[in-house]
Structure formats: C-alpha cells, structure tokens
Amino acid sequence: VGVTSDPCPEAIGSFPTGADPSKGCIYLGLINDYTGPYGALGPALELGQRSFWLWANTAGGIGDYSVAIVEGGDAQYNPAKHLEIYNSQREEVAALAMSLGTPQTLFILDELDKDDMVAAPMSWYSGYAYKDFDKGLIIEFGATYCAQGMNAMDWAAASLPVDIKKIGIIGTAGDYGGD
C-alpha cells in the first residue's frame, strides 16, 4: 500500500515534490490542524515536512523511489476527525509523515497497529519511547516533553546565579500535563 512503480506527481497542491520521473513513488499521509487550536502552527509544520521530502527527492530519493505527501487533512485537533482522516488515507499511503497531536495519535494507535502503519507524530509524548506502548510504530524526533523539562532543570541549576534549593512542579491535564 502506498508504493507504486509509477512516478510521483510533480506537485501536491501547490507544493512541488521534486520527484524524479524515472523513479517510482512512495506516498505518505499527513493529518494536520488547519482550523482548530493549532491552526496557526499546523501549516508551518506541514511546510517543514514537505520541504524535507522535496530536499530528499532532489538528493536522489530513497533507492528507486521518490516520496510524495498526499493532501493533508484538517482534523481540527479533534481525535474523532483524526481517525476519519486516517481512514480516508490508510489505503493510499505507506506511512504517516505527520500526525499532529498526542491525544489524536494515541486515538488512532490501534488502527495504525491493524495496518502495521508507521507514523511520525508532531508530538513529543514520552510514552512513544516505549515500544511495548507505541507498538513499535512511532518514529520519534526531538526531545520528549519530559526530557525537555529535565533539560530545563539541569540548565537552571547550572546557569542561574542563585542556589536552587526547591523545585515546584505544576501539572495540567491534557497533552503536556499527562506526560
């Protein structure tokens, strides 16, 4: 699924793929937020994904293949809509280049498992570091929220001009506080 000997299109929407017309195509899915609470950030994150694969394709692609990300779907940072978009892409793509949001990606994890679909969430949830939790399907990038917090504490202890004796932690429910 999602891999063909036919060449990738020259562009997806208005974004060029940089695909080599003599190579086959690997299609990747993308589930974003264009109109929900991350609507201001989602398109920039998508641009980063598309730019990476444009670069990869112009550098030779992956073996005998170029890579194209299909048109992104607007999940509005809503888990049910996220699943709806995943269902619309699952038969067309080899993997998800981007799945925006921790609760959203967790909501579709069982479906990813059924399809043996690898995903790269735009989320830094610490649970993805455990293969028995993420079923070995999540490709992490960047430091997790937990590691970022520990790094901040290490920096503060080493860099601030005061002797830190106590540290308070305030947690919130949701994406970040549950980590």
Q: Where are the predicted features?
A:
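Extracytoplasmic "Venus flytrap"
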Residues: V3-T4, C8-C25, G29-R50, G72-P79, ...
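Structural motif
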Residues: P9, Y65-R90, Q148-N151
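Extracytoplasmic ligand/sensor domains, especially the bilobed periplasmic-binding protein
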Residues: E10-P16, V93-D179
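Short, flexible coil/linker segments at domain boundaries that flank nucleotide/cofactor-interacting
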Residues: P21-K23, I62, V162-I164
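Extracytoplasmic
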Residues: K23-C25, D64, E91, K114
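Residue-level recognition of the N-termini of beta-strands and the immediately preceding loop/turn
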Residues: I26, Y65-V70, I164-I167
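Conserved strand-to-helix beginnings and helix N-cap segments that scaffold or border functional pockets
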Residues: G42-P43, H82-L83, L109
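Flexible, small-residue-rich helix->loop connector segments that border functional cores
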Residues: F52-I62
